[in-house]
Amino acid sequence: MSDRAETKPETIKRWKDCLEAGIDRGEDPIIIITFRSGWDSAARPVLARGIDKREYVIKGQQAGRQIVNDQVVARLGMAIGAPVGEPCIVEISEELIAEDSRFSYLTPGTAHATLYIPKCSSEREEINYTNQPENRERFALLILLYGWVYANDYQFIYKNARPNLVYSVDHGHFFPGGPEWKQRDLLQAASAEINHRLVSNCKLKLEDIRQGLPLLDAVSEETIIQAVAAPPSEWGLTIDERVTLVEYLVKRRQDLLAL
């Protein structure tokens, strides 16, 4: 067996092959059977019920690349144990949209979804409840996630009851360039770093963030590829864009592990 190191073209080809296989496998979408209510934010998310009797916050394809970012960031957050909404793919039928004119803006077909987190603030809030011991690790892991993918804004919500656990949702504007990112935005991005102001505002220290590095270190290249392969092909993310996104995430993971 040769010990020759893999060349970059070989790495790119391997990633591409793995991504294409992951896209082909896909996951069976959860069928949405009822719309509950909606929010008036840019992506116009909707609270809906699935055929599995669970409730989801969904964003349709009319939200553009926001749903790609949302799906990928949520999967990466889950991979390091950060408190994010549990992501999945759902299916919205034309018939269901036709039944309720309030949601006529939704695009039928597959959509991004996260499992609804009940009894939380209905809108995003500023940094809060940092004095709750239960939130220290949660904030630290979110800061690590934000540094890894690059956060253009902060999306914190909190449980209404003590200890007011923090969650991060709505990541459509993450990555350099936000929902309009192009390959060059990722290729030209600076090295990953932790937002020290955010660390300070959360009443943490860099050492608190470093405690999460073993979780980031445990994220395999395969896990990153699976996250990037998750958005269905009809969401418009090309295979070349996916390869660039994998390269971006692999590199930035290494940047942060050097903290």
Where are these regions (language model features)?
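Regulatory N- and C-terminal appendages and interdomain linkers associated
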Residues: M1-R36, I51-K53, N69, V166, ...
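Short secondary-structure transition/capping segments
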Residues: S2, E6-K8, P108-T110, Y129-L141, ...
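Charged, low-complexity, helix/coiled-coil-prone segments
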Residues: R4-G22, A79-C88, D153, Y167-H173, ...
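Conserved ATP-binding subdomain of kinase catalytic cores across diverse folds
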Residues: K16-E125, W148-N152
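A generic secondary-structure micro-motif detector
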Residues: Q62-A63, N135, W235
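A general structural signal for short secondary-structure boundary/capping elements
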Residues: E94, F156-P163, G212-V219
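Conserved kinase catalytic-core segment
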Residues: E125-E180
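C-terminal catalytic region of ATP-dependent kinase domains
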Residues: V166-L259
